[in-house]
Amino acid sequence: LPRMVKGPMTVTGFIAYAQGWGGLYIRANKLAWKQVSKHKGLGIPNRFNIPDCPERVHWENEFATKVGAPGAYDYGPERCSWMTHHITNWIGDDGFLVSSNTKIRRHNPEGDTIFIDGTITDKFEKDGDGFVEVTHEARNQDGELSILGIAVARLPKK
C-alpha cells in the first residue's frame, strides 16, 4: 500500500483530536467538580494541588514524564484510526473495511513523525466476493514501532 505520513506530532494536534473525539475525562468548572466528586480517585492533583483529569498526559509534559512517558503524547485511539484511514484510502469508495485489529507498542510524543506502511498478506474469495488481508505498521522517524495491525477488506471483483 502507499505510505501514509502523520505528523509531526504537536500538542495542538493532541487537543484537536480530544475535541473531536469528546475526551473521556475532560470537563470544565462545575462539570469537572461533579465528575471528580462522583468518581473518587479520578482527579489527580495538578501543580496547584487541584484535582484535574488524567488526560493531562497528552498536553502536559511534566505530568506525562511522571507516569513514565517521554513527554506529552498522542491518543491511542487516534493511532488506531490512522490504521483504518490508511487502508480505506487504498480500498477507495467501492471497498469495504470488514475488520481492523491493532496493537499499540509505544507513545508518539510531541515532535514525532509517523510513517504507516502496509502489505497485502492474503487474497481470498468468500461467497463470491473478493477479500484482501493487509498487515500494516507505523514507525516513527527513528524506525521505532508505534502500532501494528491486520485488516481485512472486501473489494469489488473486476
Segments predicted by a language model, with ranges:
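Hot-dog-fold acyl-thioester-processing enzymes
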Residues: P2-D94, K158
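Short alpha-helix capping/helix-loop boundary micro-motifs
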Residues: L1, S99-R105
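HotDog/MaoC-like acyl-thioester-processing domains
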Residues: L1-Q19, E110-K158
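Phosphate-handling active-site elements
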Residues: I91-L97, E125-K126
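Short, conserved secondary-structure segments in the cores of folded domains
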Residues: A69, K103-R106, E110
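Conserved short hydrophobic patches within well-ordered secondary structure
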Residues: I87-T88, P109-G111
